[in-house]
Amino acid sequence: MEELSMANTMFALNLLKQIEQSNSTQNIFISPWSISSTLAIVFLGAQANTEEQMAKVLNFDKIGSYDLTPGNPENFHGCDFAQHIQRDNYPVAILQAQARDKIHSAFSSLSSTINTPRLGDYLLESANKLFGEKSARFKEEYIQRCKKYYSTEPEAVDFLECANEARKKINSWVKTQTKGEIPNLLPEGSVDEDTKMVLVNTIYFKGRWKTPFQKRLNGLYPFRVNLNESKPVQMMYLREKLNIGYIKDLKTQILELPYIGNISMFLLLPDEIEDSSTGLEMLEREINFDNFNKWISKETLDEDDVLVYIPKFKLAQNYELKPILQRMGMEDAFNKGKADFSGMSESNDLFLSEVFHQATVDVNEEGTVAAGGTGAVMTGRTGHGGPQFVADHPFLFFIMNNITRTILFVGRFSSP
């Protein structure tokens, strides 16, 4: 499970970089955990080069014995050498099956930990499903493995003859699964008679802060979008003992805001806007697996009495991930002539048409949906001897499960 968390973190940061490149100044909110766990359902039926590309993009090739490239005996010693020799005697098919099983078993365990919080801690509403053209006919073995590892099964729809009705059916299913939060995920024209397979992934997060923000200090305050523009936004205020740190090389503060239930939001805020866009260019360029783990560790963070001001906001972002995943290296899965999903269907023309993703979050005083209300313009920024965290310009944020160290959500707030 630890290896899978590492793989998911790598995927999350790589995905963020790709989305940042195509949306240099816009708000971003995605659930890389939800995306990777849904793509794993497709990976379950992928074969040959399609499987290899997906494994690299999702970083599944970093898990256990998935990389089946023969090793050099000089690199093995003692028990490792004996295990390697013994492993070389196994048929490749058995090794591959064991490696795949380890990935999907880890997802099952990780999903159980993340998706079943203690009563009242937080809420994750998600809808994840693979919809395929009914003529493809999914293999019974694939259906059973989907049920075993992911508690779901693919659904056959009639894209060929009734594409728009299939779209409405998918939207209706998503609306029901998310209790009305996401009523129209697939827009008109998003599927047609050539559509073979669509992956739907939506997630909605509601959490409660461990220490709620002060409502009485809500009010309008200028949020600097860039060097030349500001927009009014409601700000929230909190004074509390929190983990806070400073990344000197990037002139960036990092703050941990805990939710109830082993979930935290980590915010990364540059001191000032020092580029021509959001002020986040250098920070976004330097984010990688090693740096991120260092930034959120005790090596960087210390508890202090912190004065916090952050905007009150709600983000509901829609993405069609096909071009992004293709740029990351997952090409064959979307290619009619190259895709190999023979593990899920006997049909040789099955390919992934699109991956639709929507993630929604509310950030407010309670940490969940709160009643409206206005108050005084933000005050009280002086007379405090401890550190201040004033998010009145663009910042990045990560919502993480602290037990599994899994990044559930990644966001960039650049404009109200």
UniProtKB/Swiss-Prot annotation:
CDD domains: serpinB2_PAI-2
GO cellular component terms, semicolon-separated: cornified envelope; cytoplasm; extracellular space
Top-rank lineage group of the source organism: Eukaryota
UniProt GO BP: negative regulation of apoptotic process
SUPFAM superfamilies per record: Serpins
Localization terms from the record: Cytoplasm; Secreted, Extracellular space
SMART domains in UniProt: SERPIN (SM00093)
Entries under Gene3D superfamilies matching the protein: Alpha-1-antitrypsin, domain 1, Antithrombin, subunit I, domain 2
InterPro entries to which the protein is assigned, alphabetical: PAI-2, Serpin_CS, Serpin_dom, Serpin_fam, Serpin_sf, Serpin_sf_1, Serpin_sf_2
Entry annotated with the keyword Iron-sulfur: no
Chain positions of site Reactive bond: 381-382
Glycosylation sites: 23, 228, 262, 402
UniProt PTM: The signal sequence is not cleaved.
GO molecular function, one term: serine-type endopeptidase inhibitor activity
Keyword flag Cytoplasm: yes
Pfam families hit by this protein: Serpin (PF00079)
Alphabetical keyword list: Cytoplasm, Glycoprotein, Plasminogen activation, Protease inhibitor, Secreted, Serine protease inhibitor, Signal
The family this protein is said to belong to: Belongs to the serpin family. Ov-serpin subfamily.
Function (record text): Inhibits urokinase-type plasminogen activator.
Subunit structure: Interacts with PSMB1.
Name of the molecule in the record: Plasminogen activator inhibitor 2 type A
Protein species of origin: Rattus norvegicus
This protein's encoding gene: Serpinb2
